[in-house]
Design a protein with these regions (language model features):
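Hydrophobic alpha-helical transmembrane segments of multi-pass membrane transport/permease proteins
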Residues: 45-67, 88-94, 203-210, 274-277
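Secretory targeting signals
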Residues: 126-127, 131-193
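Terminal transmembrane helical anchor/hairpin motif
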Residues: 197-291
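Membrane-embedded or membrane-proximal helical elements that form or frame transporter/channel pores
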Residues: 63-98, 103-104, 249-271
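Alpha-helical transmembrane segments of multipass membrane proteins
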Residues: 57-61, 135, 139, 143, ...
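Helix-loop-helix units of permease transmembrane domains in multi-pass membrane transporters
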Residues: 101-134
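Cytoplasmic membrane-interface segments at the C-terminal ends of transmembrane helices
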Residues: 100, 104-112, 184-197, 280-293
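Aromatic- and glycine-rich beta-strand/loop motifs that create alpha-glucan
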Residues: 2-49, 285
């Protein structure tokens, strides 16, 4: 009878005896990891190229606006106008970041590992949604802070700094509105497929292909249809809320009329709230289905 040839090696594994962190710690870890992932941090150099290219563009635009404005003594662009003008970049940022946040985990099949921990099914998508919204708000808010610092340091007194601060706060709130709406829509689309290319294409299609619908509605022979046209696209929906709440911040040219919302400003806000709520509800339903597999 041959002797057994197997050898047992003690490689030093030990049972974990530290504190067991609960739901809040897991949620926080997912959130922080999601924000880092959106900007390519902790990933390969290739994954960092596009996010930081977008960051570089928005910061360069903010720096140029600040420098030119200080030279000519005029405000080239308000903080709210900056968020509007960068919205097209935000679309592509969402199209890249959202699939990285959720599609990769769906395709690799690691979600059962997440849900085996003390993490309710709803916490995973909510942490990802909050992370994406934070990343988008930082993307639009950080350049506004650059513009604010440039204007504050070129001001004559503290009164000018205070005026700039009062202009900055609505701009940051407006950036937050962009972030919440775009994150909710983008993450829902990305969560529908495990293939990142399909998710990215779907996000771009939803945001860009709804714009022609707005154009068609705006030329119909109906004043109500014209005034409500903006609700057909996420981008113009957010812009409509901005026009309703801070028209003087977005339309600074006295000769420019801007979109006419009539008395439908509150309708835009209601539709945006319902859109975000619907996206969140569908996102939670999607992950309940995934967890039940």
């Amino acid at each position: 009878m041959s002797e057994p040839t197997g050898v047992i090696h003690d490689i030093g594994y030990q049972r974990y005896t530290g504190p067991r962190l609960g739901r809040r710690a897991v949620f926080g870890a997912l959130y922080v990891h999601g924000v880092r992932t959106a900007f390519g941090l902790g990933r390969s150099a290739k994954a960092k190229i596009f996010p930081w290219l977008v960051v570089g563009i928005v910061l360069m635009v903010a720096g140029a606006v600040t420098a030119i404005g200080s030279q000519i003594g005029e405000t080239l662009m308000t903080y709210a106008q900056f968020a509007d003008s960068m919205s097209w970049l935000v679309i592509f940022f969402v199209a890249v970041a959202a699939p990285e946040l959720v599609s990769r985990d769906l395709r690799s099949g690691v979600l059962p590992l997440y849900f085996s921990r003390p993490l309710p099914t709803a916490d995973y998508p909510m942490a990802k949604l909050l992370a994406l919204a934070t990343a988008l708000w930082m993307l639009l808010g950080a350049p506004q802070l650059v513009m604010f610092l440039g204007a504050a340091f070129t001001g004559n007194d503290m009164g000018a700094v205070w005026d700039e601060l009062l202009d900055l706060l609505p701009g940051l709130l407006y950036a937050g509105l962009w972030a919440v709406v775009f994150a909710a829509v983008g993450l829902l689309i990305a969560a529908l497929t495990g293939k990142r290319a399909f998710a990215a294409g779907g996000i771009v299609a939803v945001f860009l292909m709804t714009t022609p619908i707005v154009g068609v509605l705006s030329i119909l022979p109906s004043q109500a249809a014209n005034q409500l046209a903006g609700i057909a696209s996420p981008s113009t929906l957010v812009q409509g809320i901005g026009i309703w709440t801070m028209r003087d911040q977005l339309i600074t040219d006295p000769d420019a009329l801007g979109p006419d919302l009539g008395a439908f400003g509150p309708v835009y806000a209601l539709v945006a709230a319902l859109l975000v709520a619907a996206c969140v509800a569908l996102l939670l339903a999607r992950y309940r289905k995934v967890a039940a597999r």
